From Swiss-Prot:
Keywords: Cytochrome c-type biogenesis, Membrane, Thylakoid, Transmembrane, Transmembrane helix. It comes from Synechococcus sp. (strain CC9902). One of its GO terms (biological process) is cytochrome complex assembly. The keyword Thylakoid applies. The chain crosses the membrane at residues 8-28, 37-57, 63-83, 96-116, 141-161, 212-232, 246-263, 275-295. This is Cytochrome c biogenesis protein CcsA. GO terms for molecular function: heme binding. Required during biogenesis of c-type cytochromes (cytochrome c6 and cytochrome f) at the step of heme attachment.
Amino acid sequence: MLNAPFELVTSLGFAAFVLLLIALPIAFWSVSSDSRPGVVRLLVAVANLLLTAQLVLRWWQSGHFPISNLYESLCFLAWACTLTQLLVERAWPSPIVAAAATPMGLGCIAFASFALPDQLQSAAPLVPALRSSWLVMHVSVIMVSYAALLVGSLLSLAVLVMDRGEALQLRSSSIGSGGFRQAVTTPDSGFLELQSLEISTNEQLDSLSYRTITVGFLMLTVGIISGAVWANEAWGSYWSWDPKETWALICWLVYAAYLHTRLSRGWQGRRPALVAVVGLIVIAVCYIGVNLLGIGLHSYGWFF
């Protein structure tokens, strides 16, 4: 299986990169021209299919779930980011979503394709520490949670960019329709009736960001718990304050603070968006930065 053509796997990744590279300027043009980003969604959808084919081929080529080193996890993260983007755009087909989210999938597949050595891009057998059924459960859930948190944080960054001192209110319904329905007492009859009200672009972005981050936070929680169980089975300890574990906890605390500010303190708009952007930086440190140290139980299979 390891003799399957290496070029086909990398070519699929390169093709996805080209499509996302084409999609990005079109997305920004759609924002400036206020047009619907149908072409961008098509390009991102095809790129996602190419990434799916790449992961399936790599799985067949290596004989294990393709998430065991930095190249494979970056390709998986690019796949998860593009899928998350498509799901968010399905809820609200705005060019702003495409312009905010497309750079993440593009950046992941670009880093995997051009920044990593050929040795890391080649398929290899699993190291003994990763030969566990927990690999798929723990790592894939963590990576999907990163995708949701990254896309949600980029939407929060879009809120900051577009913020004009607008007072936002979190309204929980009809996202994607451009409005929501509110119960209002009519003065004549005294009865309650539902009235449709328009919500602003920033309110829609803020609400979508909140929902996407909430999903990512829940998945991150599951991923950390499953990792602790796996660590206890492999190393006899649920938590060892490994650099990766420590930064994963910091990431969890940042997004817990984000949700706390919204749910308990009633923050919307700019202030929680700033917290989400901090989370964006923390994920980058946790996912890439920690591995540059080359130490800890999670350092294998990332850099030579």
